[in-house]
Amino acid sequence: MTEKELYKELGTLTKNRDQWEERIPYLASLLSHESDRIRAKALWLLGETGLVHPLSVKEHVPAIASFCGSPAALLRERAVNALGRIGRGSFPVIEA
């Protein structure tokens, strides 16, 4: 799948909130994708999912937090945003 096709697929997933929780493992796997654009979208979706299902994303919090030190500003911003959304859902989930 090309980056463009994958980004479009993630855009479709964005609109289908009922699928978010079941797609968490897939989204987490995209955190290692070569494209910053795809990783940024995955971070955003994990954050939004974590607001509603914080315990379901808990195991992925360390991977999300690792992007706070990324050289890419977009990935740092998305990671901080995701952690904030997850913490809003359940603060203990993001406590170190």
Question: Can you name each region flagged by the protein language model?
Answer:
Residues D18-L31, P54-F67, G89-A96:
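Amphipathic alpha-helical scaffolding segments comprising HEAT/armadillo-like alpha-solenoid repeats
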Residues E34-S35, P71-A73:
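Short inter-helical turns and helix N-cap capping residues of alpha-solenoid HEAT/ARM repeat scaffolds
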Residues S29-G50:
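N-terminal interaction modules that seed assembly of large macromolecular complexes
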Residues M1-S29:
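N-terminal "cap/leader" segments of large eukaryotic alpha-helical scaffolds
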